[in-house]
């Protein structure tokens, strides 16, 4: 069908019921088709090293590339553990094909699950089917209004989505600074009041972490969100400015580019982005979308090879 590979969310039902061996067998079907496996690992908290080993094992035994989605160390008990996880990833990269991405925030976003709130210092509701009026509000405030403990209030809101403040800034910066990490948003566009990463991820890296914090040079920030991603996913003739390559171009002012989306007001466009071109046609110009839709699906037969320059 032209698929690049397959992804798993072993943290979530029903995928969490799948044993490692089942994922390995699925992965073996990708081997002869140059496919890859991306994963939201089974545990990004207390058992994160076990989950890393599971991910590496899937890649080794299926003989396929694996990409760790939005690598993080979640929960207060795990703050600082990126100093432990990154050397493990580095060692695995010397033996097999491993990639990873990261988003530039200390908060994650997914379904609201009362049983998985304990490691978060703050929970922000992004949507709720029975109580849509609470989208964008802190769970603690909602619970006080309801006269209920937060866990019981969360039950009343289900099904719902939430932002969880559960990471440490030191880990976010360390993972972003790691030479092999790609930048990705992990954005969820359907949420009523989404995580600001949907609008702010890439300008936040360029403006805040590169220019203001000095985490890495601008050129490295750009590489992490363009050329490195193209190499890791085998996107042939994309990711670099080169004669003959597809013209996917963002023109921005390095002195002013910055995210303006916040958790309080998450759907705000960045400043300093002058022009966005996709496949040679402008899609954003003069502060507004042009209405042109030149994007297209990239099928497997058009791809390059994971881990090699294209």
Predicted regions: what is each one?
Residues 2, 40, 101, 147, ...:
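Divalent metal-coordination and catalytic microenvironments
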Residues 174-180, 185-186, 201, 250-298:
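C-terminal cap of metal-dependent C-N hydrolases
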Residues 298-310:
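Short, solvent-exposed cationic patches
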Residues 162-173, 217-222, 230-267:
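Acidic, glycine-enriched loop/beta-strand segments at the rims
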Residues 9, 38-42, 69-71, 101-103, ...:
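Generic beta-strand/beta-sheet core signal
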Residues 69-71, 102, 155, 220-224, ...:
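Beta-strand segments within the central parallel beta-sheet cores of soluble alpha/beta enzyme folds
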